UniProtKB/Swiss-Prot annotation:
This is Glutamate-1-semialdehyde 2,1-aminomutase 1. It comes from the Bacteria. It comes from Geobacillus kaustophilus (strain HTA426). It is found in: Cytoplasm. One of its GO terms (biological process) is protoporphyrinogen IX biosynthetic process.
Length: 428
């Protein structure tokens, strides 16, 4: 493949856009650098770049394009919004319809509020939890990404009883001191942290199924223990379901796992590709939010007709019979094919998969936490990424990210991808 136009456009972008990209995850820095491919069109499971190259897409915009690019039902909803007005600044009937759909799908959402992104949703759930409890500290888990607000860009201290340190320039140490970070899937470290800080903890923030250092499932009893220990200390539990909501079933990962949080943050996937976020939970906690309570949250774009109509259409698609069975069937086919080629080539490969989402780790060990994910071979992944790109397979440019299958992918797409994996593995 030739990427002449992509390279030219990247040089131009560097003159006008910081780093040439509008999100660091779009950079190829983690896979050896170079110009990222500039995409021009997307349809179904496919991308076409500015040089005319076609790709099977497993990025799916980091998850939300679960129905496939330009799905006709979602596209029609967006057209309807364009014709009737995309932003009102007033209540609309559509936001009520959408709120009811979310509540019916995820029973723990007794009340909801729309925002514009997953970052906003997480940020606000923390504020609401602080307002409800009168406390300031939060506990989160190592390697889990919860957006780019100051309070969640905090790295772990030297141990479970140690406060965090800033994980980004511009985050004051005073904010990092409000965060305790512990390893995912480690109940005893969490218990130790709560024994030390529990009386000051407003909330425990957790991905019920990790999506941000790869697809990682909770160990049996882990989420139940978080609820028990947190509630014993008077802290709330917040689930970040920005990636997991509606990805594995019609509802949240909490439905699938049978464990309910006090508050839930959502984003990405519920908008069908348009910017949106939402948060919700127990009514008595949500009544802390203005105009009913003292916790302020507002947004001109929140609940805008375009995003809400696209979200309604997306959930209508996902509610159809056989949707998640299709994703699971193709996911299993892809996983089996990848592992078969890895065995044939003698490569250290572990695949973590749940239904239509998976992560390929270049390691022999089972990946259940962030440190194990870190030990996955990044140099090997970088070579693999570029070999796959040359064969027309678009993956996220990071060893930590998931491959996302959409409703638009077919068995032929998966078969082609498995063949490409085999060719790539033989060159590693």
């Amino acid at each position: 493949m030739q990427w002449t136009k992509s390279e030219q456009l990247y040089k131009e972008a560097l003159q006008h856009i910081v780093g040439g990209v509008n999100s660091p995850s779009r950079s190829y820095k983690a896979v050896g650098g170079g110009a990222p491919v500039v995409m021009e069109r997307a349809q179904g499971a496919y991308f076409w770049d500015v040089d005319g190259n076609k790709y099977i897409d497993y990025l799916a915009a980091y998850g939300p394009i679960i129905a496939g690019h330009a799905h006709p039902h979602i596209a029609e909803a967006i057209r309807r919004a364009a014709e009737t007005g995309v932003l009102y600044g007033t209540p609309t009937p559509h936001e009520i319809t959408f709120a009811k759909m979310l509540k019916e799908a995820i029973p723990s959402l007794e009340k909801v509020r729309f925002v514009n992104s997953g970052t906003e949703a997480v940020m606000t759930t923390i504020r609401v939890a602080r307002a409800y409890t009168g406390r300031s500290k939060i506990v989160k888990f190592e390697g889990c990404y919860h957006g780019h607000s100051d309070l969640v860009l905090v790295a772990a201290g030297s141990g479970p009883s140690t406060l965090g340190t800033p994980d980004s320039a511009g985050v004051p140490p005073s904010i990092a001191q409000e965060v305790i970070t512990v390893p995912y899937n480690d109940v005893e470290s969490f218990r130790e942290a709560m024994n030390v800080w529990g009386e000051q903890v407003a909330a425990v923030l957790v991905e019920p199924i990790v999506g941000n250092f790869g697809i990682v499932l909770p160990k049996p009893g882990f989420l139940e223990a978080i609820n028990e220990i947190a509630h014993k200390e008077g802290a709330l539990v917040i689930y970040d379901e920005v990636i997991t909501a509606f990805r594995f079933m019609y509802g949240g990962a909490q439905n699938l796992l049978g464990v309910e949080p006090d508050l839930t943050a959502m984003g990405k996937i519920i908008g069908g590709g348009l910017p949106i976020g939402a948060y919700g939970g127990r009514q008595d906690i949500m009544e802390q939010v203005a105009p009913l309570g003292p916790a302020y949250q507002a947004g001109t774009m929140a609940g805008n007709p375009a995003s809400v109509l696209a979200g309604i259409a997306c959930l209508e698609v996902l509610k159809q019979e056989g949707v998640y069975e299709h994703l699971d069937r193709l996911g299993a086919m892809l996983e089996e094919g990848i592992l078969a080629h890895a065995r044939q080539c003698g490569l250290p490969v572990t695949v973590n998969r749940l239904k239509g989402a998976l992560t390929v780790f270049f390691t022999d060990e089972k990946v259940e936490n962030y440190k194990q994910a870190q030990r996955s071979d990044g140099e090997l992944f970088a070579k693999f990424f570029k070999l796959m790109l040359k064969q027309g397979i678009n993956l996220a440019p990071s060893k930590y990210e998931a491959w996302f299958i959409t409703l638009a992918h077919t068995e032929d797409d998966i078969a082609y991808t498995i063949d490409a994996v085999g060719k790539a593995f033989r060159q590693l």
